[in-house]
């Protein structure tokens, strides 16, 4: 399966290493790079992570924008300029850079949240707050999915 699913909370050690869930690594294992691309989320106070193939799709979408627009410049700066290639070690861990940890408020634990083609890495309590608001929105907008086809 090529989809990031489920939620996991893993500890972050003193060297800022965290184990990426095994099923996420399996999805990423289909990529050319043995690791993950991580960048600050532009939607939430979390880290977004994906494989090289998704970054390529984002690049193609961003390139459709006016090359001199503020929007394109902002997307390129945040997504590409702030993105980091995080390699897996022999135990399936990555080292989270301090800049990304600070952006997400991550200290001792990281909450991995599957979102289909990407996954997010949250500070666990912040994710629980977000989950409550997301549940309300999903309930209110549930009929939207009926018309998705």
Swiss-Prot record:
It comes from the Bacteria. Gene3D superfamilies: Transcriptional regulator MraZ domain. Its main location: cytoplasm. PROSITE patterns: SPOVT_ABRB. InterPro entries: MraZ, MraZ_C, MraZ_dom, MraZ_N, MraZ_sf, SpoVT-AbrB_dom, SpoVT-AbrB_sf. It is found in: Cytoplasm, Nucleoid. Belongs to the MraZ family. This is Transcriptional regulator MraZ. It comes from Rickettsia canadensis (strain McKiel). The gene is mraZ.
């Amino acid at each position: 399966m090529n989809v990031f699913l489920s939620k996991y909370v893993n500890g972050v050690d003193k060297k800022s290493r965290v184990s990426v869930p095994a099923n996420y690594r399996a999805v990423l294992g289909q990529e050319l790079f043995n690791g993950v691309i991580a960048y600050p989320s532009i939607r939430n106070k979390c880290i977004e992570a994906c494989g090289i193939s998704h970054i390529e799709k984002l690049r193609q979408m961003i390139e459709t924008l006016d090359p001199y627009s503020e929007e394109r410049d902002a997307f390129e700066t945040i997504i590409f300029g702030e993105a980091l290639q995080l390699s897996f070690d022999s135990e399936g861990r990555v080292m989270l850079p301090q800049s990304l940890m600070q952006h997400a408020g991550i200290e001792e634990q990281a909450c991995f949240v599957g979102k289909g083609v990407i996954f997010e890495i949250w500070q666990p309590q912040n994710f629980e707050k977000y989950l409550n608001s997301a549940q309300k929105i999903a309930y209110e907008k549930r009929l939207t999915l009926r018309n998705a086809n």
